[in-house]
Amino acid sequence: MPHDIPADAPAAPRHGDEVVTSRELVMALHRSAIGRLVMLSADGGEGGLGGVELGRAIARAGMSCILIDLTGEERIAAETGIAPGSPGLHEFAENLAPLGEIIHRDSRGACHVVLATGAAPQPDSPDVTLVLAACAEAYDCTIVALDARRMDSLPSLLDEETAIVVAGQAATPDGYATVAGELRSLGVDDLIFMQCAATRRAGRRAPDQPD
């Protein structure tokens, strides 16, 4: 799977090696032809919000960015302050809302967000394919947040301008190894690992930390 991140870009190869921060990853993106990042969570916790953190970092760096949430959960909507009941991919697929109405703005940043309202759609569905194609034309970078339990759907999201990022906390290195092992068993060996900056506990957000 070709990923055009430069050879000198920060990368986190094997278990036990250093993990990049969102800032380092943004620097690498500036020097590459990568236009899409598929985000997988290494721990099911903070890693599930890795796409939000990275999207904010990309937007702060002056690049246009959109986050497509295919996790089927509510974490990303809650973190970005998008109102419950806002239209998403389901409404778009059912012709209940045009593309422009399912694109929301992160309440704490300039990154745009598309939600998978209701059940998470299949990444290879015609509607997701159409949205991804439109976003590739309109944004510098598209982030696709995907449930790590749906790795079998990865091939439909990958091309020569796509990279896979495994996000999580430094305190849970085994999570990186587990997800990486599963990906490599599928023949995916070119991975980037990202350490999330903040820790959230008991539903309360910790103060922002520089990434």
PLM regions and their residue ranges:
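Conserved catalytic-core segment of NTP-binding enzymes
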Residues: 124-211
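Short, highly selective alpha-helical patches that border small-molecule cofactor pockets
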Residues: 47-51, 55, 176-180
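Post-Walker A helix-loop "phosphate-sensing" segment adjacent to the P-loop in P-loop NTPases
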Residues: 56-68
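A generic structural signal for alpha->beta connector loops
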Residues: 62-64, 110, 187-191
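P-loop/Walker-type NTP enzyme "switch/lid" segment
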Residues: 6-16, 27-49, 66-140, 148
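Short, charged low-complexity intrinsically disordered segments located at boundaries
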Residues: 53-55, 120-123, 164
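Acidic-aromatic/histidine active-site loop/patch
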Residues: 1-35, 87, 94, 170-173, ...
